Amino acid sequence: MYLPNCTYYVSTPDFTSSFLPQNTSCQINFPYSPNIAQVQPVREVAFRDYGLDHPSKWHYRGNYASYYSADELMHRDLLQSSSSRADVIFKNESLYSHRGGTSSPCNFFTGIGRNGVLPQGFDQFLDAPTSDKSTAEPLKQKTDCGVSGDTGSHRQALTKEDEHKDEVIGGVEEDSSSNCGDNNNQQNPPSRSRKKRCPYSKYQIRELEREFFFNVYINKEKRLQLSRMLNLSDRQVKIWFQNRRMKEKKLNRDRLQYFTGNPLF
């Protein structure tokens, strides 16, 4: 980038090469109007000194004076930063370098902050999280208290509902037990009225066995005759003969298995 009607001086020690002629300086003139204001040389634009580097780093600074002061350059570069942050960071005017050629190295932060690592300018950023934590803890406690209160009321409601359910279940069980008792009482009289099973006497069994020996199937007349003689009902005699026939079949089956298993017989 160049500006019209400007004279650019290039120093020999800075830009030297074996391929270039060893002239002291090269002057370039441009035929433009001289009314345009003079600007600083290209050396000052290309190699700014913000007061951050040691003067011995750049050897060319010993022969040329800085057109802009370090304060103005620093102010121009920090225009976009917020004023509050700039006030906190740049507290002392001694932090800036007023002369680039003879200025000493500049330290932006002279002291160490609270945490022992960052400078003092970062203390405000460290205070904000702690304050947020301190404000968040009471809110958390309040929310915990609210949640605990809600849970306590919910538990009380659940306990009341459980008690009510238990009472209802107990009443239902009592009603069911009373109903069962009534049903048992209603069913018990018929069972008591039922006649007990009385075995046949020896005389009755002997007469029935003798009749079964002659006739496996008994007719109705013979059955009525036996019932009158043995003082039994017609139905009892009929059932006894049915059971006796089933018993006889079982005995015959057992005899058959016994003889087939023993070939000696």
Swiss-Prot record:
What Pfam families does this protein's entry cite?
Answer: DUF3528 (PF12045), Homeodomain (PF00046)
Comp. bias regions, Polar residues: 177-191
Q: What is this protein called?
A: Homeobox protein Hox-D11a
| DNA-binding region range list | 193-252
Instruction: Provide GO CC annotations from the record.
Output: nucleoplasm
* Protein family per UniProt: Belongs to the Abd-B homeobox family.
Family annotation (Gene3D superfamilies):
Homeodomain-like
Q: Where in the cell is it found?
A: Nucleus
Q: Which UniProt keywords apply?
A: Developmental protein, DNA-binding, Homeobox, Nucleus, Transcription, Transcription regulation
- Residues annotated as transmembrane: none
Cite the GO molecular-function annotations of the record. DNA-binding transcription factor activity, RNA polymerase II-specific; RNA polymerase II cis-regulatory region sequence-specific DNA binding
List all Basic and acidic residues biased stretches: 158-168
Looking at the record, which segments are called Disordered?
Answer: 123-199
Superkingdom of origin: Eukaryota
Annotated function: Sequence-specific transcription factor which is part of a developmental regulatory system that provides cells with specific positional identities on the anterior-posterior axis.
SUPFAM superfamilies with a match to the protein in the record: Homeodomain-like
PANTHER family on file? HOMEOBOX PROTEIN HOX-A11-RELATED (PTHR46092), HOMEOBOX PROTEIN HOX-D11 (PTHR46092:SF2)
